[in-house]
Amino acid sequence: MTYARITGTGGCLPEKILTNHDLEKMVETTDEWIQERTGIKKRHVAGPEETTCDLAERAARRAMEMAGRSSADIDLIIVATTTPDRVFPSTACLLQKRLEIHGCAAFDVQAVCTGFVYALGVADRFIRTGGAKCALVVGAETLSRIVDWTDRTTCVLFGDGAGAVVLEASEEQGILSTHLHADGRFDNLLHVPKGISTAYSEVLAGEAYIEMKGNEVFKVAVNTLGRIVDETLEYNDIDQAEIDWLIPHQANIRIIQATARKLKMPMDRVVVTVDEHGNTSAASIPLALDVAVRDGRVRPGDLLMMEAFGGGFTWGSALLRF
């Protein structure tokens, strides 16, 4: 049986850091209030000339270096992003050009905070069916471009960054299953209400911002993530005690803690980066994975549960042997 196995990870965070104390000077908020409700202490913000593809490229090169792979080896590129460099071509095509990779399929996936899990699921299916042997899967965002920095309910949450993995065909166990879902009935609870075909002038003027009904999102997210955890465990016929690490989307420490309780996992078996990164949307899971791999927590053979929830609503999970 052919599996899709992660052989390299990479991450990239912009140099500029925005702390909670910095935000205290911008909006009516406090460091204590932000930490108590979100767990976030700081977030990274892209520079004026820094783009999503810039971050994606750095993360991708680091993942390829860890995997020992060159541009000639990559035969599929998928970038999960909500903040592409251009309307078209895709950020994946722009990344392909920078990496001097020619001819393979390259496309973007847009599932907001669930984007990386969606992209991982797509790449897994390519590899399992023989459509690819060495895929580059990236989650990259510059959410600071679509944050209203006068809205204290949202501007404290989000950060910029990119994470990447190299996924290769292998006889060894890798991705065991992915589970992808969406329900568009909840679109107005978390969204950017303006787009190219509905409000082009506002988009052009830079007036398209994230809007969120936080309490309602929280309630749906906690219940939905509980269900996706059950679905993943049941599908693979395993007990939660067998999972070595939970690597969740880094949205909010309270949501992360709720999912950990569902799995009966102590927080020291949960990879948490939301305090340092904020919510980087599609980048959060691969960034967290890269941090945990490079600091030695996640080791070969570990069983990992990834789960995410995002605008749409979208949600999903991946169970994999690292």
Swiss-Prot record:
The keyword Acyltransferase applies. It catalyses: malonyl-[ACP] + acetyl-CoA + H(+) = 3-oxobutanoyl-[ACP] + CO2 + CoA. It is found in: Cytoplasm. One of its GO terms (molecular function) is beta-ketoacyl-acyl-carrier-protein synthase III activity. Pathway: Lipid metabolism; fatty acid biosynthesis. Transmembrane segments: none annotated. Residues 250-254 are annotated as: ACP-binding. GO terms for biological process: fatty acid biosynthetic process. Keywords: Acyltransferase, Cytoplasm, Fatty acid biosynthesis, Fatty acid metabolism, Lipid biosynthesis, Lipid metabolism, Multifunctional enzyme, Transferase. The active site is at residues 113, 249, 279. It is an enzyme of class 2 (transferase). Its EC number is 2.3.1.180. NCBIfam families: fabH, PRK09352.1. Belongs to the thiolase-like superfamily. FabH family. The last Arg residue of the ACP-binding site is essential for the weak association between ACP/AcpP and FabH. Catalyzes the condensation reaction of fatty acid synthesis by the addition to an acyl acceptor of two carbons from malonyl-ACP. Catalyzes the first condensation reaction which initiates fatty acid synthesis and may therefore play a role in governing the total rate of fatty acid production. Possesses both acetoacetyl-ACP synthase and acetyl transacylase activities. Its substrate specificity determines the biosynthesis of branched-chain and/or straight-chain of fatty acids. Homodimer. This is Beta-ketoacyl-[acyl-carrier-protein] synthase III. It comes from Thioalkalivibrio sulfidiphilus (strain HL-EbGR7). The lineage of its organism: Bacteria, Pseudomonadati, Pseudomonadota, Gammaproteobacteria, Chromatiales.
